[in-house]
């Protein structure tokens, strides 16, 4: 069994205690690694190291910070096979998908490095003669980055790269479900030659995470996680009025218009719902189909969902992999059972398979209602509830009648329909004739309970800055 060490102040170090967190492969349930259970003292030492390093890091010309990030991206790309192998074991992804995630993480790191010369301020006219107003962009300081289990490599760089180019230093807490890939990333950090303390990576329990996030030197907490995790982070932020950046839950609606290419739409929706067993915050979570094409579209969905086979992707990469844990599977199965009890029709799936691994079949439910739990709450699994509508206004109303507003999808061939939905949908993203993909030059930000702030692009990078107004009298 491999054993990892925390990465703090430029060194791989043993934790203060001899406690470890065991990591298992969700496809086999076999333990394969153990990672340190950092103590509050370990977390505070990491923040102290980051705070000390930030004083010099922030004063480096941004082009020099970019040079570090480019070397980091080179190291990530070179280490993609090792990062991918670790990620495949801890997540149940195929080695190819996991390695591609590492390569993509290198790409987003390069993208943010290229912002070095474009972190711009403003010159604002003054109302007073002989006076100028300068608005400057400055780093926040130490950023605590809390990483989810579903895309732990990409999401780590999605937060760390913009934080670093803006002049911040970081303390990263990976998910305890998928931490081993983070320590492979730590090796890439080391190979890139960052100054000690600029990047720190530690695994820990919730109590230690609280000590990390409430340290007075932490100026920002960046989380991708559940709504409940977001509420907890807001509590942490209260201690020192730290800035929150929260990418939280989603319940992506897909609206299928009568003129849509039904075959194309069905294939895309099933791929979205079964990629990584539906464990994506932007996966299709509810489908609204026009009455006139409902039966045809459901038949297409049923055939495609029934054809999806679950299994260990290390043995067969064409299969759908496992959920993250037994608890996640029990939660999802309970939601399906309650939906059927409330009147939904189970078209395919909906049973827990025998044998090892946290697998769950692609599951299609029809005759669902807007008030059902399966429509109102995030499943985060391969379950697709389908509802009918008769008018576009009704479909938009259903889509917007929700606590979440992260992403949304529309299939139509009519420009007027697309623009009507684009101007009315209550979500941070709308994808027309495709499913969500989060381009890193865009801005991934949710409405309502889906979050505060956002990731990606110019606006995602600026999340990691604060402003200073200089009023210059001459």
Identify the residue ranges that each predicted region occupies.
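Conserved C-terminal structural/oligomerization subdomain of aldehyde/semialdehyde dehydrogenase
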Residues: 26-34, 218, 255, 309, ...
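ALDH superfamily catalytic-core signature
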Residues: 228-369, 432
């Amino acid at each position: 069994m491999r054993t990892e060490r925390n990465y703090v102040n430029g060194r791989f170090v043993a934790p203060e205690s001899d406690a470890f967190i065991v990591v298992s492969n969700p496809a086999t349930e076999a333990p394969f690694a153990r990672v340190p259970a950092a103590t509050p003292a370990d977390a505070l030492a990491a923040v102290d190291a980051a705070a000390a390093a930030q004083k010099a890091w922030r004063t480096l010309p941004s082009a020099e910070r970019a040079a570090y990030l480019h070397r980091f991206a080179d190291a990530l790309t070179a280490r993609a096979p090792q990062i991918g192998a670790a990620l495949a074991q801890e997540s149940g992804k195929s080695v190819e998908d996991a390695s591609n995630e590492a390569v993509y993480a290198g790409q987003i790191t390069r993208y943010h490095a290229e912002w070095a010369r474009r972190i711009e301020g403003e010159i604002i006219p003054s109302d007073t003669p002989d006076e100028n107003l300068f608005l400057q962009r400055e780093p926040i300081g130490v950023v605590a980055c809390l990483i989810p289990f579903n895309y732990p490599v990409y999401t780590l760089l999605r937060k760390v790269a913009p934080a670093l180019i803006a002049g911040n230093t970081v303390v990263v807490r990976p998910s305890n479900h998928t931490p081993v890939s983070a320590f492979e990333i730590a090796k890439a950090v080391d190979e890139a030659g960052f100054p000690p303390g600029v990047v720190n990576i530690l695994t820990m329990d919730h109590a230690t995470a609280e000590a990390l996030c409430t340290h007075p030197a932490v100026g920002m907490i960046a989380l991708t996680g559940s709504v409940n995790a977001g509420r907890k982070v807001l509590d942490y932020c209260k201690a020192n009025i730290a800035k929150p950046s929260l990418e939280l839950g989603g319940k992506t609606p897909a609206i299928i218009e009568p003129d849509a290419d039904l075959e194309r739409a069905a294939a895309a929706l099933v791929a979205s719902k079964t990629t990584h067993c539906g464990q994506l915050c932007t996966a299709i979570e509810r489908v609204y189909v026009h009455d006139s094409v409902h039966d045809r579209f459901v038949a297409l969905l049923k055939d495609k969902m029934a054809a999806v086979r679950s299994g260990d992707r290390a043995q067969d990469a064409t299969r759908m992999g496992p959920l993250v844990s037994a608890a996640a599977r029990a939660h999802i199965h309970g939601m399906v059972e309650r939906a059927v009890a409330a009147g939904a029709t189970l078209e395919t799936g909906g049973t827990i398979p025998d044998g090892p691994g946290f697998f769950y079949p692609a599951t299609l439910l029809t005759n669902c209602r807007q008030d059902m739990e399966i429509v109102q709450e995030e499943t985060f699994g391969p379950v697709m509830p389908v509802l009918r509508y008769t008018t576009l206004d009704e479909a938009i109303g259903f889509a917007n009648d929700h606590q979440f507003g992260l992403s949304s999808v529309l299939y139509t061939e009519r420009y007027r329909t697309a623009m009507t939905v684009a101007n009315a949908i209550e979500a941070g993203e709308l994808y027309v004739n495709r499913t969500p993909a989060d381009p890193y030059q865009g801005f991934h930000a949710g409405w309502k309970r889906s979050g505060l702030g956002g990731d990606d692009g110019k606006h995602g990078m600026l999340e990691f800055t604060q402003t200073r107004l200089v009023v210059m009298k001459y």
